[in-house]
Amino acid sequence: MQYSLGIDAGGTYTDAAIIRDSDGEVVAASKALTTYPDPLHGMKTAIDRLDKPLLKAVKLVSLSTTLSTNTILENTGFPVGLVLVGDYIIPGDLPTNYWIAVAGGHDSDGEELKLLDLDSVKAFALKVKDKVSAFAVSSYFSTRNPEHELTVKQAVLKLTGHPVVCGHELSRDLGAFERAITAFLNAQLIPITHKFAGSITEECKSRGIKANLLMLKCDGSVVGIEEALEKPIETIFSGPAASLVGASHLSRRETCAVIDIGGTSTDVSMMQAGIPELSNRGAVVGGWQTRVRAIRMETSATGGDSHVWVKKDRFNVGPKRVIPLCRASVLYPGFLEKLRKSRVPRSHLSESVQATKFFVRTGFEPLELNKQERLIYRYIGEEPVSFGDLLGKLKQRPSSIALDSLIRKRLIQAIGFTPTDALHVLGEYNEWDTEAAFSGATMLGRLLKQDPADFSSGVKQRVAGNMALDLVAYLVEGMARPEIEKVLSGGHFTKFRVELPVVLLGGPARAYRESLESLIDAEFLVPEYADVGNAIGALVGKGIKRVEVLIKTRKVSKAGGNEEKKEHGGEKASESGVIEDTLHREMENEFIVFSPAGRAKFNVHGEALEYAEKLGRKLVMEYMTCAGLDNENLKVELSRKNLAPKSWSGPPMETKLVFVGVGTPLPPSRTFHSNKSPDEGQTNRKNYKT
């Protein structure tokens, strides 16, 4: 009997699940707290809680992890040298001090605009080679002709031996600056991803697991570890992608919306006909716009660990994240007694100052602290301390700015009342210490003249309302959120109806189902194993490869020159993708095919089209083979779009062909099997441990 193991390292929890290959049954699952900065320790704990005999029969391991995302957000990637080729405008700051802009680049037809200044590139590479761990290069219109990027790559690799990432290798979209950022971030992640993959491989070997290793990408597809090592940037936001794929699989719904209720945030996304819906724009991470294709999602900073705090006779939810009181009481013996004794004057109340808020060290070593940070950090130890404790030790009010800075630097963590605590009070989620949650609700509710149950019910309803708002905002793009809130308020005798199933994932998913049904008319499903759906999503993700091929028509003189350039100074196109129609004299057509494999020229449109179709399918098949995916059941769909102005005659000005191949890394017989309907409870599990 063979099995497969899926692991997802999320913002709060790391989930693991084992699926039996013969029938797709989930036979074991576990959870552990995610560890920072290295998620490997949390993964080890989750694996430790699975049955050893099953682990030794595992033949495939698939991962989704926050490693890439956290590295970029925390700016802890390796130093990279950036080479910009061409005369394009840099719209903002660059993410590195090690960069150079040199002459070169191509036009929209892939013709060379200027000779590449390779000497300057070589001098730069030699100058910074001991200061960086990798290089990135982005050339103007490299998507139409990657020659200059490849030349730079070969030269820098020969001189330094460092990895070199090209923009055209990561994206076929226009936007030279965004490709440069994407290539830079990818280069930053390569050393970290190599180390992580090596650690996972060694961990599997030490447990007797002889398995192929896959990673989930942010578009919901899986990829072999070799490609993941080359393009780690594509694994950012793989967690939301895992939840989407897992929800579709567990609910047996190929088309559905998904609400993933995590500890840090709540994410809304959508699956259509078994394929994740992707964003038209690239993913934004750490404030940087990339050209990485990711799932389209609506994200709010409201999750199970969002801080609930009171000020001016009202409670607020988030946006900051804390350790729930109920969990802190289990992690730190004696915490409950400290909580009960904590007091804060009503006049001092703020997000940082609550009777229910505490602080504790994380164990990371401090590096650069200012005077205020050092002073506060000295009085925060390995046991939680309250605001009142700090006030007594400092003899002055602790700086909220310094506390927030210490939290951002991951030197301390905050503890406070959360939606998870509210569910414990209501008896709808009982994973940790209910008594601590009840004490917190009593203290905060007293400020609003509410009993613990009423206060907790209000928190739960607020969180459910935020989920409903995010769902409608996702499905009805462009609708103003205040208008959505008016309908959801229930005061207009109206209600939104969603005509596709909505799958809820996350530990507390079942607790919010009834509240969501009161707000929106929809079929809400909570499948079995909803609380480890991300781990299952990491495992059952399909192999999806998108290849774009562009055929562009241009006019050339019969002598072979580009008449358009002679008459009009070249086609008026830029990396923004804007193309201006021009008038043409009596000339011949030439058809240029642009693809990831390079460019090719034809004199007959039909020949160009035939070449493009064969090439696109070939590239999809080659990718699937390299990724170790099942080619026998591979489906390749082709969509074609022609572009031509009204005055245009003859073959289209442009023809865009998009090939989408869908395969599976696992036997095609694998489908989720359960005797229960998708919305039945999570009972009678096998080997489920927390």
Residue ranges of predicted features:
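N-terminally biased helix-coil "hinge/interface" segments that flank
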Residues: 1-690
